[in-house]
Amino acid sequence: MRLPVNRSLFIPFIVAGDPSADLTVDLALALQDAGADVLELGVPYSDPLADGPTIQRAAARALAGQMTLPKAIQLVADMRKKGVKIPIIIFTYYNPVLQLGEESFFALAQENGADGVLIPDLPFEESGPLLELSERFGLPLISLVAPTSKQRIEQIASAAQGFLYCVSSLGVTGVRETLPESLGHFLGEVKRHSRVPVVVGFGISTPEQVAMLKDACDGVVVGSALVQKIEQLLERLQTLEEKNAAIAEFASYARSLAAPLREPCSSR
């Protein structure tokens, strides 16, 4: 996976199929135009253990529209045809991968132009077989590291591929007004052991929070705030006369979240 160098990464997350497959492609293009460096494409799942209510509702909408793991992966090829050039990470729970078949999953992801995979409910200790497949197919398996994993940070960081995803706080995803005071120390500890870029997600939802974190890590992931914006724009996105204006409003919102990362860093 080729990542930009000498700049903080803006990594947005959206749910495949919310509100539709075609609109997911349009929103991906809008995010690229807004300055996204990597796109996390979430695969809807009926029991999303790591996700809060905003992403759960988005997943329910996508599942109601018959979105599946294979269809979500095929959306990557559609995005490539429409001009999305940034790396795309498939974010999926393990059960759909198991149902499809692990090798089939990696083969399909590679065939359709994905750049990596992230499986939030896959324990690091059980990731060996998938790490072998990720190496064979050239698709990094992105690792998650949480604040409870201090003894395991060095172990997880040593095996990290692509980038290392730090979970800002325990619990599910979702918009948060404040971030833990200990987050800076945690990120510093992870960076000391990591050979790949260190990004942080879960709960980052305002430009002020992005600005606060940019010197402590190599990038931020914003998910629930963007999915919430899509939810607010649902009716307009699905109205022919208002679709383009709604996409432009979404892009403007994403740009405001990325903006602090484009300002000079005080210490990197």
Curated annotation (Swiss-Prot):
Record field: catalytic activity: (1S,2R)-1-C-(indol-3-yl)glycerol 3-phosphate + L-serine = D-glyceraldehyde 3-phosphate + L-tryptophan + H2O
CDD domains noted in UniProt: Tryptophan_synthase_alpha
EC number of the protein: 4.2.1.20
SUPFAM superfamilies hit by this protein: Ribulose-phoshate binding barrel
Subunit structure: Tetramer of two alpha and two beta chains.
Keyword list, A-Z: Amino-acid biosynthesis, Aromatic amino acid biosynthesis, Lyase, Tryptophan biosynthesis
InterPro entries cross-referenced by the UniProt entry: Aldolase_TIM, RibuloseP-bd_barrel, Trp_synthase_alpha_AS, Trp_synthase_suA
Class of enzymatic activity (EC top level): lyase
Signal sequence segment: none
Protein species of origin: Geobacillus thermodenitrificans (strain NG80-2)
Protein purpose: The alpha subunit is responsible for the aldol cleavage of indoleglycerol phosphate to indole and glyceraldehyde 3-phosphate.
Organism classification: Bacteria, Bacillati, Bacillota, Bacilli, Bacillales
Pathway(s) per entry: Amino-acid biosynthesis; L-tryptophan biosynthesis; L-tryptophan from chorismate: step 5/5
Family indicated by similarity: Belongs to the TrpA family.
GO-annotated cellular components: cytosol
Gene name tied to this protein: trpA
Gene3D superfamilies, per the entry: Aldolase class I
GO terms for MF: tryptophan synthase activity
Protein name: Tryptophan synthase alpha chain
Positions annotated as active site in the UniProt record: E40 (proton acceptor), D51 (proton acceptor)
